[in-house]
Curated annotation (Swiss-Prot):
One Pfam family this sequence matches: Wzz
Cellular compartments per GO CC: plasma membrane
The organism of origin for this protein: Salmonella typhimurium (strain LT2 / SGSC1412 / ATCC 700720)
Annotated metabolic or biological route of this protein: Bacterial outer membrane biogenesis; lipopolysaccharide biosynthesis
UniProt name for this protein: Chain length determinant protein
Subcellular location: Cell inner membrane
InterPro entries on file: Bact_polysacc_biosynth/exp (IPR050445), LPS_length_determ_N_term (IPR003856)
Main localisation: membrane
Function: Confers a modal distribution of chain length on the O-antigen component of lipopolysaccharide (LPS). Gives rise to a reduced number of short chain molecules and increases in numbers of longer molecules, with a modal value of 20.
Length: 327
């Protein structure tokens, strides 16, 4: 018991031992210093809140365009390629993919300019390609909403113009292909006509040599190239005249090609009739700013001011009570 009592007495007299009650008393005595430090910290925080740039984020959710928005474009593709035209679902997926790529490119441009702007695009639901969430950060709520809507419209118009150019290029190429097809079919039809006339002329020569002027056969449907001269020279001469003035004969494919070519020439697709996205949620008007956070800033100011004030009080008291050890 004696040893424990002495030990306790020794600990109580140790000058290096921290006495919690004494510590609290020191802080209480220096409360004015702490209060002043807290007030200064709050004033600095208020000053920061007044000069700091506010950040407001507007968000929109978009997805692929619906069938009506791509109807003009898909109809044009159907005219161009018929049964080989892409499905409407493929067109919709292509449109939103091009929008996403163009929007990402614009985001990079804005981020790399002298006065950076934060424009983002990402999956709205993780793991799902659609819908997409796009957002823009500005110094005002109205500005964020307005600029986001403007950038979405800007990308939509740019992609629509690109699609219009692509479609016009395809129209030019397909028109050239169809015209070449028509020319080829016309050449073939003319060659067939010339061949027919030569065959009749050859039969006429044989008929003249054989001195056959009148038909020697009754069933003309049985006439072949070898027996055509039996029709007689008079009939063969009439046939040559008829063949020379007879229009070219074409297959149904020729007239279908001409109809397709006419339909293509009548196509009218402009950028303002094409939209490459559809809103699921239009750009929001933010009601809470991202930063600076007033409540958090003031709470941190109070805590920091209190800690600095307490440090000043304790440091000052420690210097006053400091006694250098004797050598």
């Amino acid at each position: 018991m004696t040893v424990d009592s002495n030990t306790s007495s020794g600990r109580g007299n140790d000058p290096e031992q921290i006495d919690l009650i004494e510590l609290l008393l020191q802080l209480w005595r220096g409360k004015m210093t702490i209060i002043v430090a807290v007030i200064i910290a709050i004033l600095l925080a208020v000053g920061y809140l007044m000069i700091a740039k506010e950040k407001w984020t507007s968000t929109a959710i978009i997805t692929q365009p619906d069938a009506a928005q791509v109807a003009t474009y898909t109809n044009a593709l159907n005219v161009l390629y018929g049964g080989n035209a892409p499905k409407i679902s493929e067109v919709q997926a292509n449109f939103i993919s091009r929008f996403s790529s163009a929007f990402s490119a614009l985001s990079e441009v804005l981020d790399n300019q002298k006065e950076r702007e934060k424009l983002t695009i990402e999956q709205s639901v993780k793991g799902q390609a659609l819908p997409l969430s796009v957002s823009y950060v500005s110094t005002t709520a109205e500005g964020a909403q307005r600029r986001l809507a403007e950038y979405i419209q800007q990308v939509d118009e740019e992609v629509a113009k690109e699609l219009e150019v692509d479609l016009k290029d395809n129209i030019t190429l397909q028109t050239k292909t169809l015209q070449e097809s028509l020319e080829t079919q016309e050449v073939v039809a003319q060659e067939q006509k010339d061949l027919r006339i030569k065959q009749i002329e050859e039969a006429l020569r044989y008929a003249d040599e054989a001195k056959i002027t009148q038909p020697q056969i009754q069933q003309t449907q049985d006439v072949t190239q070898d027996t055509m001269f039996l029709l007689g020279s008079d009939a063969l001469k009439s046939m040559i005249q008829n063949e020379a003035t007879r229009p070219l004969v074409f297959s149904p494919a020729y007239y279908q090609t001409k109809q397709t070519l006419l339909d293509i020439k009548n196509l009218k697709v402009t950028a303002d009739t094409v939209h490459v996205y559809r809103y699921v949620m239009k750009p929001t008007l933010p009601v809470r700013r991202d930063s600076p956070k007033t409540a958090i800033t003031l709470v941190l100011a109070v805590l920091l001011g209190g800690m600095i004030g307490a440090g000043i009080v304790l440091g000052r008291n420690a210097l006053r009570s400091y006694k250098p050890k004797a050598l």
